[in-house]
Amino acid sequence: MPLAKIHVVEGRYDEARIAKVSGAVQAALMNTLRVPPEDFYQLIFELPKNQFLHTPSLVGLHYTDDLIILDVTFIQGRPKQTRLALLKDINTRVAAAADVSPDDMLITLYEVPGENISFGQGEAQRANAVARA
């Protein structure tokens, strides 16, 4: 069920590069969280530069206009080591696939209880789900 929200500056990523980012994110989710290929939900936001605001550097990292802000929401229960591995896997795959600096990825993971998600019909289909990875 992971939902990935990919935010980039308008005009910095063409369709092919966005597809590479998208594919790399999904590949990392499949690899690290063991998400099946058909479990695919992504929203891609291209924002004007004046609506994509960020500090130029933080904690020794330097951001460019290629910065990707990525939010990933999934059902809670995965151990800390798995979440840390996911951050690294996403970063490595996106950097390699889309020619993005490893500095230019701000990733936030959100874990929510299964009862807080409905895939339709107002039902919490994963209310009693146990995380796989």
Describe the function of each predicted region.
Residues M1-A133:
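Interaction-mediating elements
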